[in-house]
Curated annotation (Swiss-Prot):
InterPro entries: rRNA_ssu_MeTfrase_G, SAM-dependent_MTases_sf. This is Ribosomal RNA small subunit methyltransferase G. GO terms for molecular function: rRNA (guanine-N7-)-methyltransferase activity. Its EC number is 2.1.1.-. Specifically methylates the N7 position of a guanine in 16S rRNA. S-adenosyl-L-methionine binds at G82, F87, A133, E134, R152. It comes from the Bacteria. Belongs to the methyltransferase superfamily. RNA methyltransferase RsmG family. GO terms for cellular component: cytosol. Gene3D superfamilies: Vaccinia Virus protein VP39. Keywords: Cytoplasm, Methyltransferase, rRNA processing, S-adenosyl-L-methionine, Transferase. Its main location: cytoplasm. The gene is rsmG.
Length: 243
């Protein structure tokens, strides 16, 4: 069986597992995305994962697994905070072209690369933002305007909640993709989540078939407005998390 058929089948099964349609257009966008990631990665650090099958499993399918949380299959307005190489935001957009998706990253070079990738894979309705999450969360255009915020960023959950929850409208969700050992991190972050207007709803384990990768979806519901003093000045949430 050739690699093209293998990759199509892997992606198709992942889509079926989250009840989303998969087709040739989506497949071709994923393959173009993979190739462009590899081309750009020598110039701008986007990913430590460079093998084709690993990119598909550990970036694309891992991102698609976020749709195991059913709310994200229907949410209209979604922002990906600290998107890096475009994960999970671009795979989400490929799978849900109807969604209004925004990508934010603090590194201008990465945003320029993502603009190039999006253009070349035929997606022209994603907003990309270069800047600090703490600064744009104060902007009325973005503050509490999103049905969902997603992030695969490496910050601890208390800090990440301060970056992300201010963007979520009341009744919406913040979904963090975290590693396998998340219970202690969640316990430490509960104070921050509460202060910022959130409530932990669920921790959902995610496994990638035929892979050593394990993740947890930490699902936090926004139940009240974030106090206006949050997020604090850039860098504060990292240095002095609300714990």
């Amino acid at each position: 069986m050739n690699s093209e058929k293998i990759f199509y089948d892997i992606l198709n099964v992942a889509a079926e597992n989250v009840d989303l349609e998969f087709n040739d257009k989506k497949y071709n966008q994923f393959i173009q995305y993979k190739d462009l990631l590899k081309d750009w990665n020598g110039k701008v650090n986007l990913t430590a994962i460079t093998e084709d099958e690993e990119i598909i499993k550990k970036h694309f399918i891992d991102s698609m697994k976020i749709f195991q949380f059913e709310y994200l299959r229907k949410a209209n307005k979604i922002i990906d905070i600290g998107t890096g190489g475009g994960f999970p935001g671009i795979p989400m957009k490929i799978m849900r072209p109807d969604a209004d998706i925004v990508l934010l990253d603090s590194l201008k070079k990465r945003i320029n690369v993502l603009d190039d990738i999006l253009n070349k894979i035929g997606i022209n309705d994603v907003e990309t933002i270069h800047g600090r999450a703490e600064e744009f969360a104060k902007n009325p255009k973005y503050r509490e305007k999103f049905d969902a915020v997603v992030s695969r960023a490496v910050a601890n959950l208390a800090s990440l909640s301060e970056f992300c929850l201010p963007y979520v409208k009341v009744g919406g969700y913040f979904v963090a993709l975290k590693g396998p050992a998340v219970d202690e991190e969640v316990k430490i972050a509960k104070k921050a989540i509460s202060i910022l207007g959130g409530k932990l709803e669920e921790i959902r384990e995610v496994e990638i078939e035929d892979s050593d990768l394990k993740h947890n979806l930490v699902i936090i519901k926004k139940i009240k407005n974030t106090p206006k003093q949050y997020p604090r000045k850039p860098g504060t949430a990292t240095k002095k998390p609300l714990i």
